[in-house]
Amino acid sequence: MITVSIVTYKTNLEELSKCLQSLTSSFISQIYVIDNSHQQYIADFCQQYANVEYIGSDNVGYGAGHNQALRQVLDSDKKYHLVLNSDVYFEPSILEKICRYMDENSDVGQLTPNTIYPTGDLQ
């Protein structure tokens, strides 16, 4: 199972929605949205997702924001964790492929997939 952390700051809800909708895989157990702008509209939006935990925060920065989620994840039995921006979304089945690759390659500790723009161009 995978946990996910997404750090936001006054994020557009359409962007966040697209990201969260791409994380509907059965492989995702928990998603942490760490909102560095502590906006009520983001908190309200996150309530519609059963597996999303909203963490309102002062602007502690990107890394420290993800660390807030990682502190909770480290004590869990989850095997993998994704660190994401809210403008990232996945094609269907890619998370299953990523998990399978990591399971089959125990010498790999971190994976960064190719990033492709919506136009199809490689970033």
Question: Each PLM stretch: what is its role?
Answer:
Residues T11-S25:
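Short, well-formed alpha-helical segments that are part of the catalytic scaffolds
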Residues S22-I55:
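Acidic donor-binding segment of Leloir-type glycosyltransferases
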Residues E91-Q123:
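Conserved donor NDP-sugar-binding/catalytic core segment of glycosyltransferases
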Residues S57-S76:
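Glycine-rich, basic loop-to-helix element that forms the pyrophosphate-binding segment
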Residues K78-D87:
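Short beta-strand-to-loop acidic/aromatic patch adjacent to the donor-nucleotide binding site
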Residues V60, D87-Y89:
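Acidic metal-phosphate-binding loop of nucleotide-sugar-dependent transferases
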Residues I2-T3:
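Cell-envelope/extracellular polymer assembly enzymes that use nucleotide-activated donors
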Residues I6-T8, Y32-I34, T112-N114:
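Short beta-strand segments
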